[in-house]
Regions:
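N-terminal leader/linker segments that initiate helical-solenoid repeat arrays
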Residues: 2-74, 81-84, 90-91, 97
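Helix-start (N-cap) detector for alpha-helical repeat units in TPR-like alpha-solenoids
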Residues: 69-70, 103-104, 137, 145-146, ...
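Register position in tetratricopeptide repeats
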Residues: 81, 115, 151, 158, ...
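Structural marker of alpha-solenoid helical repeat scaffolds
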Residues: 64, 98-99, 132, 175, ...
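Flexible helix-coil transition and linker loops at the boundaries of alpha-helical arrays
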Residues: 61-64, 131-145
Length: 316
């Protein structure tokens, strides 16, 4: 998985941002608890706690009070989480026809259109949501706003409009610079605009946070090839194989990259990880130490060295 502990059975990595069940607080149907899973973290708008409400309860709430926008938004979010896209859109449309600036309905509508492959229809609600939230004093810590920027960027990428996608994705990264999905999509935007150096920078940052990000390595291969850097392409192919648990293939490519690029810390690091999986711990330790000499401030390298040293000691 891209993010450790992340949910399974979701689309390819670049399409992953999962929205899950929200709730409706029932003290005679009072407050909506709008929440969503954002990668492997649970984010709650306004820091309200969600309740575990069944779909039957949510549907009953809407039938009993069809004019309540919060009830419809909660139901729409539940439908979105279940992949029932047409039902989700039906609910958000009902809300937006009366309350065109309901931010919950706008965000769910935009995400639902993106997830259902209707990227063009996603643009308007996402842009309106962003316009309503971007000038808030807390905008730079607004995770819902960050998510809207991400989906707007993904939608523009899908539509082949990289020049519009990249600013949205960069705005998402200002709020959360560790969002590997946004970094990957920004890399795709840069590729489309033939800025392969910048694309590689984005892909590199993505795999820093998610070492097994297969699609990011595929992006690296494409950009390194475009830049006529075959040895760096070997590194990316090796790490792609590593992410797919094909460690022998990874070893072959990474050893080739190491020989051609002895000062490239990432090749040594990739080899350390590969040797570790092949239980060649002494070789892994040598490789990670070389990587640390080349990149002494890399905390990830320090952690891997400690892990390998601990494993060697455990073997006696």
């Amino acid at each position: 998985m891209k993010f450790f502990g992340r949910l399974n059975n979701i689309h390819s990595r670049e399409l992953i941002k999962y929205i899950w069940t929200a709730g409706l607080a029932f003290a005679a149907i009072a407050l909506m608890f709008f929440g969503y899973y954002y990668k492997d973290r649970y984010v709650r708008v306004d820091d309200k706690s969600p309740l575990d409400i069944s779909i039957d309860q949510l549907e009953i709430a809407v039938r009993e009070n069809p004019e309540n926008p919060e009830a419809r938004v909660a139901l729409a979010e539940f439908y979105l989480g279940k992949g029932l896209y047409s039902q989700a859109i039906e609910q958000t449309d009902q809300v937006l026809s009366t309350f065109p600036e309901n931010t919950g309905a706008l965000l769910i509508s935009g995400i639902t259109y993106t997830r259902s492959g209707q990227s063009q229809k996603a643009i308007a609600p996402l842009e309106k949501f962003i316009d309503l939230r971007k000038d808030d004093p807390m905008a730079l810590s607004d995770t819902a706003l960050q998510t809207a920027y991400y989906f707007l960027g993904e939608s523009y990428n899908t539509l082949g409009q990289a020049d519009k996608a990249l600013p949205a994705l960069e705005a998402a990264l200002k709020i959360n610079s560790t969002d590997a999905d946004a970094l990957f999509q920004a890399g795709l935007s840069s590729q489309t605009m033939n800025d392969h150096e910048k694309a590689i920078e984005f892909f590199d940052r993505a795999v820093l946070f998610v070492p097994d990000f297969t699609e990011a390595y595929a992006g690296m291969i494409e950009s390194y090839t475009a830049l006529n850097k075959p040895d760096h392409s070997d590194y990316a192919r090796g790490m792609q194989a590593f992410s797919l648990k094909d460690y022998k293939t990874a070893q072959r490519y990474l050893e080739s990259a190491r020989e051609a690029l002895p000062d490239f810390a990432s090749a040594h690091f990739g080899l350390a990880l590969t040797y570790e999986q092949l239980n060649r711990l002494d070789d892994a330790l040598i490789s990670v130490k070389i990587a640390l000499q080349l990149d002494p401030n890399n905390f990830s390298l320090q952690q891997v060295q400690e892990r390998i040293e601990t494993a060697i000691k455990a073997q006696g």
